[in-house]
C-alpha cells in the first residue's frame, strides 16, 4: 500500500504543478467588502502565479473584529486552496501533495489570520467569502475559468450521531441528523 500511496501523492503533485506551469506568470488582486457588525469588512488578496506555485497574500484585508467572525489562517487557507483547486485542477485528487503548491499568507491579527485569543466562533461568516475574493483575482489572470460568484461558496453537509437522552431502552439509542444547505 505504501507504493500506491506514494504514487498517488506524487502523481497529484506533478499534475497540479503542470497545471500551474501552464498558467500565465502574472499577479492580480481581488477585493470585496461585506457588511460587518460595526463597520464594513474588506477581504483583499493578491494572487501570483510563480513558476510551479501560486501565492495568495491577504495583505490589505481588514483587521480583527470584536465579534467572532475572525478566521484563523488555517481556515482561510482551506478556502483559498479550495478556490484555486476548483479553478485549475478539480479532477486531481485533493491531498497534501496537490495542495502543497498553493502558498497562502496573511498578516497576523487580521480578519483572515486571527491569533489566540481573538474570537473565531463564527469564522464561517467571513471564511466562506474567501473563495469569491480569490476567484475575483484569479479571473483577471485566467478569464472565464473560475465559477461565477454565488452564495459565498457555501456548501454545507453536516452529519451527526448523538445519544438520545429522551429514548427508552435500548440504552444505546442514537439520534441521526443529516443537514445540507446551499450549493456554492
Regions found by a protein language model. Name each.
Residues 1-184:
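Glycine/proline-enriched, intrinsically flexible loops and inter-domain linkers
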